[in-house]
């Protein structure tokens, strides 16, 4: 059974490349890469990122946690995030429409968040991230 989605194909069938819905919704970790293009639909990177950093005393389970890639400091995490926004900027020229970073906060054993799970530590340099995001937003106008 195939159920149509108003948002994107990822929600209606397991193979997100099937031509249903209004979006081609790809998920790629960790780097934002679009490995397919569909001229008939919005091309969306529904998930990318997963930049991990274990912040001691701010993790769900000390002995069990992961990220798609691991770093050891706020600067390293921020640098990687900025690198990814530069990659997004390059994708816009090729017809890219949107992206969703995974994830805003750590979730249980996943340490991929921009903040710790209890939201007490912001793991990135907010000013640099804000500037990088603004550059992307301005390029879409």
Features from the language model and the residues they span:
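Alpha-helical scaffolding within the catalytic cores
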Residues: 14, 26-39
